[in-house]
Design a protein with these regions (language model features):
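The alpha/beta-hydrolase serine catalytic core
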Residues: 8-14, 21-23, 34, 94, ...
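A short loop-to-beta-strand scaffold at the N-terminal edge of the catalytic core in hydrolase folds
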Residues: 29-41
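Short beta-strand element of the alpha/beta-hydrolase
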Residues: 46-55
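The serine-hydrolase catalytic nucleophile loop
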Residues: 56-69
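Glycine-rich "HGGG/HGxG" loop immediately N-terminal to the catalytic nucleophile
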Residues: 62, 84-97
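Conserved alpha/beta-hydrolase
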Residues: 69-90
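Alpha/beta-hydrolase active-site loop
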Residues: 94-113
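Primarily recognizes the serine-hydrolase "nucleophile elbow" in alpha/beta-hydrolase
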Residues: 108-167
Length: 271
């Protein structure tokens, strides 16, 4: 890990004179070290920074995450990071619970570069995290988000209505499943169950307003059917969320093509 810089980050102003990505380790409020990458906007200095929260088993260096970052960087600066238990980050995954602290650290780091707007976008598990983060950090100036987009997010916990989700629950909840997660999927999963159970995405959504909220979901998502995004949009209240139902789209960042990513970037950048 000699190529990373660990320790407190400094406040700085980013311009087109600093085009190279910056990789570092962030420390969360509960002491977990999180790998993160900052990429300036390729079009020059930008007011907005987009913080990207990947899905379960993803990481900062996964091709789908890098593809999204490249598209987003055409409109804004971008921060990507690996959730705890993923990639080069420390700790073990809590599958959406304490990951809110990882996102908060990434948002604070993005703000340290002087951007006037910092927005979040999350995919699948990351989608649930950005919703909970927006609900929980609205009053915390340095860690709050100015807009939030959730892609392929679940509305409720413990969903087992599809075969992929039943397999995922086996990976997370069984000792042999966690071995498969670690050595087969590269994800280190915490063995303890949630206690207490965190606020669910659908319970979080009503607490997000007046922060702009976008919910995106594919009509061919094999994990979460369309009642999930519709439930989230309804919970937000009339006029409090945009809902994009994408024809032919599957699940999360792996299914997001460059056209959709470009539309997301425009929405997040306020264009």
């Amino acid at each position: 890990m000699s190529s990373v810089v660990e320790g407190p980050f400094r406040r700085s102003i980013v311009s087109s004179l600093t085009p190279a990505p910056l990789r570092t380790m962030l420390r969360t409020d509960d002491g977990v070290c999180i790998e993160a990458v900052y990429e300036p906007c390729t079009a020059g200095s930008a007011a907005t920074a987009i913080v990207v929260a990947h899905g379960f088993t993803g990481s900062v260096d996964r091709p789908a995450v890098r593809r999204a970052a490249q598209v987003f960087a055409q409109r804004a600066a971008v921060v990507t990071f690996s959730f705890r238990g993923h990639g080069g980050s420390g700790g073990r995954s809590t599958v959406g619970d304490r990951e809110v602290l990882d996102l908060a650290a990434a948002v604070e780091w993005a703000r340290s570069f002087g951007h006037t707007r910092v927005v979040t976008v999350g995919f699948s598990m990351g989608g649930s995290v950005v919703l909970r983060h927006a609900a929980m950090h609205g009053g915390r100036k340095e860690a709050h988000t100015d807009a939030v987009a959730a892609v392929s997010a679940p509305a409720r916990w413990y969903y087992r209505g599809t075969a992929p989700m039943r397999r995922l629950h086996w990976v997370v909840s069984r000792p042999l499943g966690r071995v498969v997660g670690r050595f087969g999927l590269g994800t280190r999963i915490h063995p303890e169950e949630w206690n207490p159970v965190p606020l669910s995405p659908v319970e979080s959504v009503p607490l997000i307003a007046p922060t702009p909220l976008l919910i995106v979901h594919g009509d061919r998502d094999p994990y979460f059917p369309l009642d999930h995004p519709r439930m989230l949009a309804a919970a937000a209240g009339e006029g409090q969320a945009e809902l994009w139902l994408e024809p032919g789209m599957g699940h999360a960042e792996n299914a997001a093509d460059e056209v959709l990513l470009g539309r997301l970037a425009d929405w997040l950048a306020g264009e």
